Amino acid sequence: MSDGSGRYVPPHIRRGGGNSHESAAADGLSGSRYSGNGFFSSPNRGNHKSSGGFFGSRPFNDRRTGQGSRASGSGGFGGSGGRYGWVNGKHVPYPKNPRLEMELFGNATDHVTSGINFDNYDDIPVEASGDNVPEAITEFKSPPLDELLLENVELANFSKPTPVQKYSIPIVTKNRDLMACAQTGSGKTGGFLFPVLSELFLNGPAPLPEHTRHSYMRKCYPSALVLAPTRELAIQIFDEAKKYTYRSWVKPYVVYGGAPIGQQMRDMDRGCNLLVATPGRLNDLLERGKISLVNVKYLVLDEADRMLDMGFEPQIRHIVEDCDMPSVNDRQTLMFSATFPREIQHLARDFLKDYIFLSVGRVGSTSENIQQKVLFVEDYDKNSALLDILINEIDGLTLVFVETKRMADQLTDFLIVQNFKATAIHGDRTQAERERALHAFRNGIANILVATAVAARGLDIPNVTNVINYDLPTDIDDYVHRIGRTGRAGNVGVATSFFNSNSMNIAKELMDLLTEANQEVPQFLVNMVQDSMRFGRGGRNSRTGSNRGRGSNTRDYRHSNKDDWGSLGSSRRGFRSNDNRGFGNNWGSSSGDGFTNKAANSWW
């Protein structure tokens, strides 16, 4: 490039000039690639929409402030003259940005308040097994948490840790691996984000590998990797990470299938220290050489049982064992979920070392904050029963679960004709349509969301007061995750399920679950279970083929005898690998129903 006189101007001189790219970014000019045409500010990105993108001005996106991208000209540590970020071996928080703060945290009145039963969480039994279990904390404080992290937690309106956080925070900060099982809606996301981010804030970025210092290719070197089974859950975790990395040197990013990979690769050039990913898209980026895992200090598997048990095991093993990720002894591995069947605990041995098993409440149990109702409704009466509930009993956001994509569209159309503001989410809808549907539901534009199992696990949608199982799932663990979309963070909710003879395979487990949660067990369910047991039918878990039974899945199976442990071994089982679960083909739905999705099946 030349100046006005035609003379060549070196890049380091151009960067210092008033027309530099970085100056434009710092000033928030629309011409900057950081401000209006990137992933974070795309108008079709639902909750990611923002004027100027998530990172905003340079203090939130300058690559020089922290390791994470190969584009850093000085090895990723501070840049010459950098005043904020990781500077001279110390974390210097960026100044407050009121506009970004409002965008991330909203007004105090926007937050989901702790419900009337939040304090009852202190009475939930907690079991922590393993060697030298760290003492639980009772409040958010420093230490063990970093001061900046505490400020961001306060901005998010969290005043006290949930039971899983009370234990997970000291466990992670003491450099221990963790397998954590807790009720849905009990703060598992904060259970790993809080301590991981706090440790990153305190310890700073790892140096780039020596052999990469002079590489011409831009590559991201995340310090923390979070794997999630669905793109909706990945986006949700990323949204939370944006809040808690506010004003820090850590840059979060999310990658998932269904979005343009080229745009994701360009966005990662800005740096990525905490990466949230679905396994398929991450494998793609690893094969393209865009990401290196050599600096990963923290590996988190959220909804780990679903990823391992439902077909993601080969992809996860490739990521963990065949790429350049540090070995199990050189990283911390954290596994979080609401259910952990014994087989999955056995598989976890390959990913964790000397770990602590944390069980908050009964593993796979439901929260007593959820009032559970089971009604006997034949298939041909379901629409009428649903209307009766929606008209007479429900106020607030309602999540309706069905088994097939076809039924999701048909039921949504039916509700719209009945003048309800409804929308649908399932695997045949495009990514933009799904994000718009979730955005409308979260913000009350549509107060009814009809969903297949794609939305059943992990999603934290505030203010969902009612869950209706129009179709019951075939697996009792899926039932737990579905109804866990309400009654979150200590708030109360109602879950209503339509039961008939088609759901007999979970009848016994459902009755046990209702009993354990101190819920009313309808007499028809008791009679049907007794009849099925008399004739040797029902009461079997469809996935494992074994009786769940009261109190099963609660203990640390390392305490089982050797024969029990060795019954499954650590061999790689032939699970089907498909990152399109919940993306192109929907979990729990009929993928071959021949139904063509109607993009217009939303009331707006």
Curated annotation (Swiss-Prot):
Superkingdom of the organism of origin: Eukaryota
Low complexity composition bias: residue spans: 541-552
EC number: 3.6.4.13
Residues covered by region (Disordered): 1-79, 535-591
InterPro entries, sorted: DEAD/DEAH_box_helicase_dom, Helicase_ATP-bd, Helicase_C-like, P-loop_NTPase, RNA-helicase_DEAD-box_CS, RNA_helicase_DEAD_Q_motif
Motif (DEAD box): 302-305
Signal peptide region: none
Biased composition (Polar residues): 32-45
Span of domain Helicase ATP-binding: 169-358
Pfam family, one: DEAD
Keyword Endoplasmic reticulum in record: no
Localisation per UniProt entry: Cytoplasm
Top EC class of this enzyme: hydrolase
Record field: catalytic activity: ATP + H2O = ADP + phosphate + H(+)
Iron in keyword set: no
SUPFAM superfamilies: P-loop containing nucleoside triphosphate hydrolases (SSF52540)
Family per similarity comment: Belongs to the DEAD box helicase family. DDX3/DED1 subfamily.
PANTHER family: ATP-DEPENDENT RNA HELICASE DBP3 (PTHR47958)
Domain comment, as recorded: The Q motif is unique to and characteristic of the DEAD box family of RNA helicases and controls ATP binding and hydrolysis.
Name this polypeptide is given: ATP-dependent RNA helicase DBP1
Species assigned in the record: Candida glabrata (strain ATCC 2001 / BCRC 20586 / JCM 3761 / NBRC 0622 / NRRL Y-65 / CBS 138)
